[in-house]
A protein has these predicted regions:
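Formylglycine-dependent sulfatase
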Residues: 2, 11, 18-197
Length: 197
């Protein structure tokens, strides 16, 4: 079993000037292969689980103070169809070619929540995999226009990267490299916001 791989960080920041009220910031984190052994779920299986290497104290705190789903199911057994459902709010078979693993094409007639948030004044951005393998030009979250990969994209291959680097410099240094990459990507997103967002 591979380590949990966070493949999505969809970042959204609110603009309070559009509606006159203080709208919340939204950070949507979506992961492939999260599994029952990862982070907050680890307590269910015990501290000696196979993913004990991955320490996610902030995610765990949010999960413990909010809702933690321990019996949830995806609408499809593959990443792209599942993600097309999450992005659109539709069953994957109602998203047409957007549910195809390789060569997915988004139908612009199907609304997606990231672009709807952007229309209402939110600053949106993403880092790492969001919908389908590769970087499709018509992605339903702004595609290249909203990408924040300035720090790199090695986090997409968390377990492969740490496994390759760990023998020379240790697991902690390998993990820190990846965390720094994530911080740089997020800082670039924050730096791009317009005033009031």
């Amino acid at each position: 079993m591979k380590f949990s791989q966070i493949l999505l960080l969809l970042m959204v920041s609110a603009s309070s000037s559009l509606s006159g009220d203080d709208r919340p910031n939204i950070v949507f984190l979506f992961a492939d292969d999260w599994g029952r052994y990862a982070s907050a779920y680890q307590e269910i299986e015990g501290p000696q689980s196979i993913n004990a290497l991955i320490d996610t104290p902030h995610f765990d705190r949010v999960a413990n103070e909010g809702a933690l789903f321990s019996n949830a199911f995806v609408p499809a057994p593959s990443c792209t169809p599942c993600r097309s459902s999450l992005l659109s709010g539709r069953y994957f078979w109602n998203t047409g070619r957007a549910a195809i693993l390789q060569g997915a094409v988004w139908d612009p007639e199907i609304p997606s929540y990231p672009l709807e948030l952007e229309k209402s004044g939110y600053h949106i951005g993403y880092s790492y995999k969001v919908w389908t393998p590769g970087r499709p030009a018509n992605a339903p979250y702004g595609a290249k226009r909203t990408a924040y990969h300035q720090g790199g994209t090695n986090f997409n291959r968390f377990s492969q990267y740490t496994s390759a680097k760990a023998p020379q410099s240790g697991v902690e240094e390998a993990k820190e490299d990846l965390y720094e990459e994530v911080r740089q990507n997020f800082d670039a997103f924050i730096g791009d916001r317009k005033e009031g967002q």
